[in-house]
């Protein structure tokens, strides 16, 4: 049987290789299997792995591993560095089949040089745990990097220094050593007004998706407001960042993973704004404001994990997380409405987090598995505000929870059964405590190699104590899914979920009561056809969202000659959204598509988004109906690297409309962007970026950047950049808000020159 499979795999590879090759696009093929080494032993993942070869035709500016994924079919990299494959975030990045950065795969993507690796292997249905591989189905996605031999068991480093005007500099260092017993990756950067850096405190604080913090640190609107041009046009920004991860092999079956992250940012903002409140009739008012904000953010996170894996008999995993985050803001605000006044405010926020998880799995007679796990966390959130208008405001928030599970599982031929009991105690604030006790049973059946059926049922009781009141009720959850897998690309996935709990409990947990999910994709060599449809219908009693929620999305993807053509549609309907000032009914629709023109080596893409909302808002003591409509259209064209030239052009149109009472306000903005790169010689690269911001009514702005990169050798590079060459010192943008028009004016640092030198060894 295995011989037949290998023959099928080889024939499949021949079909893939026989497709028309295009030098401008990264080639890929399906490989028979990949070896994954979780500490001890070898796990083989077959029939679900794609290999991408890293060619010399990639963008010459490619430096780090995350730059590679911008050129690979199906991958997308966000501004935060998260990597998605066909809309699903990857679970992990392995190096030669071994887990290295188990806490955050971005440590590998951001701090390792792309030249260290020869190929990228995509793993579908990835399982990091040998026990889960036998008993639980998973649709997780992971990436394995094949490292070149000359970079193993040696120190690899990237060192860079950037000097900018006026008086700006930044130093960066990335050091790694990937040995047999010790694997370490570290990155440090120090920035003094050279580049603008913003990071999300919430992005680095979560331990896992199932553990949520009570509240994120709230940034001032000046810091959270986005601008339609490059962030480094703003000045007065200093930061330092240290990220490190270590993986230590202890003996033959134990591993210790350690990660340390430290980030601090000190930045200043200044802007002036004018807001016109207009609802028609007799109500119309204008407000002018000049604001200066000083902000300091810091985050320190320490994680340690211990894993022991004794082949197929016993596995244990323990983790400790310590986090400390702080935010301090000083505000100077001058307001002119009926009269003028100056306000000085000081606010500080902090959050301390402790998290622990541990569990053991024991296999008996190669059929039975006993499992025990426990999770516990404590979060303390503090916020204090001293303001001339607010006077003072202090908030202390505490969240504690502990979850324990005792379960067992066994296998009878192609059927796997698992049952157990879970206990949950959660405290939020001083007046709310939740207790849940429920038993669960799961069944998984593999009907041949193609069909897989799973069911899950949970029944128990819940007890909520809130401000002296007590709620008790019977709770249950039913879940079922059917998976038909013909090949790596050909599958049908159907899922249904139904649950019932106490409405008051959902104040803490946002979950749909009813959920349906279906996915279908089919492959006809040499053409891949993918159609994904997902529908979610549910009702939730969360303190933010209440009422009926509906989500639908459908995506069509066609892969021909290693080129992806796709079109997608998704909609989102949410009614009766609870806000602090009333209810909101909204609808959102998104459509996108792209096609690759072989004759011109150009990818054309289109994107359309529509959002509509209705709500009541109290304005000057009077409830006013408000309707907001926002539309965005984006058309882009991007060439692949063909010989010496690369171009990227995008045209975006944004339209905003608000109706408040009898008054109507609208604004339209066009944003054009052109990126050109030219490889002047083998080790030289020049680039130009031009942006044109054109409001329908208002001033036209143009921004131009230029860079010249010279690489005398494989290890040394010099880059000269000129930012904001049009010397724009002040930028004014108009926004449509629910009850009027807001004009915001921001001061820029003007023309800026930078020179960067970097070396890799």
Model region roles, listed by residue range:
Residues 18-33, 39-328, 347-352, 357-374, ...:
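Membrane-proximal, glycine/serine-rich, low-complexity loop/turn segments characteristic
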Residues 138-161, 253, 263-282, 302-307, ...:
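Surface-exposed extracellular loop regions of Gram-negative outer-membrane beta-barrel proteins
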Residues 295-299, 303-307, 345-363, 378-454, ...:
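Outer-membrane beta-barrel transmembrane domain signature of Gram-negative proteins
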Residues 440, 522-528, 545-642, 754, ...:
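Outer membrane beta-barrel strand-and-loop segments of large Gram-negative receptors
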């Amino acid at each position: 049987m295995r011989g037949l499979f290998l023959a099928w795999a080889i024939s499949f590879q021949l079909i893939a290789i026989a497709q028309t090759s295009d030098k401008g696009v990264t080639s890929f093929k399906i490989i028979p299997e990949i070896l994954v080494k979780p500490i001890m032993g070898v796990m083989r993942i077959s029939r679900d792995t794609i290999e991408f070869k890293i060619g010399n035709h990639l963008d010459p500016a490619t430096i780090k591993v995350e730059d590679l994924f911008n050129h690979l079919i199906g991958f997308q990299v966000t501004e935060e560095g998260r990597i998605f494959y066909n809309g699903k975030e990857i679970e992990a990045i392995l190096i030669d089949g071994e887990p290295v950065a188990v806490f955050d795969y971005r440590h590998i993507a951001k701090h390792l040089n792309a030249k260290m690796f020869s190929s990228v292997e995509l793993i579908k249905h990835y399982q990091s745990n040998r026990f889960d591989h036998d008993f639980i189905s998973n649709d997780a996605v992971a990436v394995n990097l094949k490292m070149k031999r000359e970079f193993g068991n040696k120190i690899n480093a990237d060192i860079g220094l950037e000097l900018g005007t006026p008086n700006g500099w930044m130093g960066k260092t990335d050091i790694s050593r990937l040995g047999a017993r010790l694997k370490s990756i570290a990155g440090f950067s120090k920035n003094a007004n050279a580049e603008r850096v913003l990071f999300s405190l919430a992005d680095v604080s979560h331990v896992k998706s199932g553990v949520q913090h009570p509240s994120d640190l709230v940034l001032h609107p000046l810091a959270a407001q986005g601008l339609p041009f490059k962030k480094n046009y703003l000045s007065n920004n200093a930061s330092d960042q240290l990220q490190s991860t270590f993986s230590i092999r202890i003996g033959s079956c134990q591993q210790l993973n350690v990660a340390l992250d430290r980030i601090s940012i000190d930045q200043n903002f200044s802007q002036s704004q004018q807001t016109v409140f207009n609802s028609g009739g007799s109500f119309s008012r204008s407000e002018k404001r000049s604001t200066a904000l000083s902000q300091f953010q810091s985050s320190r996170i320490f994680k340690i994990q211990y894993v022991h894996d004794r082949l197929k008999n016993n596995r244990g995993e323990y983790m400790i997380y310590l986090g400390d985050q702080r935010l301090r803001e000083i505000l100077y605000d001058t307001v002119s409405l009926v009269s003028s006044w100056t306000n000085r405010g000081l606010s500080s926020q902090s959050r301390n987090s402790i998290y622990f998880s541990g569990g053991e799995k024991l296999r008996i007679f190669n059929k039975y598995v006993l499992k025990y796990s426990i999770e516990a966390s404590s979060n303390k959130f503090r916020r204090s505000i001293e303001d001339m208008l607010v006077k003072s405001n202090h908030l202390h928030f505490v969240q504690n929870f502990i979850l324990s599970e005792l379960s067992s599982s066994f296998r009878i031929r192609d059927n796997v059964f698992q049952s157990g009991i879970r206990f949950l105690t959660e405290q939020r604030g001083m007046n709310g405590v939740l207790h849940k006790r429920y038993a669960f049973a799961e069944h998984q059946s593999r009907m041949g190699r193609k069909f897989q059926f799973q069911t899950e049922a949970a029944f128990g009781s819940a007890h909520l104590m809130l401000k002296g009141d007590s709620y008790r009720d019977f709770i249950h959850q039913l879940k079922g899914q059917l998976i038909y897998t013909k090949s790596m690309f050909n599958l049908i996935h159907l899922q249904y979920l139904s649950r019932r709990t106490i409405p008051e409990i959902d104040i803490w947990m946002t979950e749909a009561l009813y959920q349906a999910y279906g996915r279908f994709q089919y492959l006809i060599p040499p053409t891949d056809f993918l159609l994904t449809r997902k529908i979610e219908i549910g009702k939730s009693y969360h303190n933010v969202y209440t009422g009926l929620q509906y989500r639908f999305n459908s995506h069509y993807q066609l892969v021909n000659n290693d080129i992806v053509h796709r079109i997608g549609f998704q909609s989102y309907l949410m009614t009766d959204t609870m806000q602090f000032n009333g209810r909101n009914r909204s609808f959102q629709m998104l459509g996108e598509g792209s096609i690759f023109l072989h004759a011109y080596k150009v990818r054309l893409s289109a994107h359309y988004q529509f959002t509509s909302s209705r709500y009541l808002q109290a304005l000057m003591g009077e409830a006013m109906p408000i309707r907001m409509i926002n539309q965005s259209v984006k058309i882009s064209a991007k060439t692949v690297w063909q010989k010496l030239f690369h171009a990227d052009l995008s045209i975006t149109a944004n339209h905003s409309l608000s109706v408040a009472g009898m008054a109507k306000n609208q604004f339209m903005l066009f944003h054009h962007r052109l990126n050109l790169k030219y490889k002047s010689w083998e080790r030289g690269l020049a680039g130009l970026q031009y942006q044109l911001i054109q409001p329908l009514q208002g001033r036209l702005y143009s921004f131009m950047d230029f860079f010249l990169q010279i690489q005398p050798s494989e290890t040394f590079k010099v880059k000269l950049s000129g930012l904001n060459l049009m010397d724009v010192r002040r930028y004014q943008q108009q926004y449509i808000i629910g009850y009027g028009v807001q004009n915001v004016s921001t001061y820029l640092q003007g023309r800026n020159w930078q020179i960067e030198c970097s070396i890799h060894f």
